[in-house]
Amino acid sequence: MKDKPKIKTRLKMVIAKNGKLLVTYDSMEDYYYYIGGKLEYGETVLEGAEREIKEELGEDIKLDFKKILYIRDFLQPEKDEHGLELFILGDVNKFEELEHYFDSEHGDKKWATWLDINNLPDNLFPKALTKKLQEDFKRNFSKSGEYVGKMDR
């Protein structure tokens, strides 16, 4: 009997500062995505978020965890993927120093970059979240824990 696939919990950071959004750019695939990764077994959401920030932005980066903004279903049955994504609003203790920070895990093909939050590119994934994020930014992210359902890539 085949084991049932597991549901993965992913943490995605929404780091907005000075009208900019901190994301990762993948130069091989030419797209942007929110910084984050999988929640490990035995970790709290806060511990996982802090670990992911350090892994992707450096050991000296501190995360100021504000709140969970969005909860999203991530379903790709054709790839046996089923996940739950938590988009976390937070802040970090650095700004300009993070531009083009290379994540050692991914070499020189992926790096952190700040994007103008009012002019986000079409290749920021998930695309379906962009307009909502921009509207919520204008409202100072007043809501929290909002279920946004299943969104296409």
Language model regions located:
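Conserved beta-strand residues within beta-sheet cores
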Residues: 10-12, 62-65
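N-terminal strand-loop-strand
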Residues: 1-34
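Short, solvent-exposed loop/turn segments at secondary-structure junctions
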Residues: 31-32, 71-76
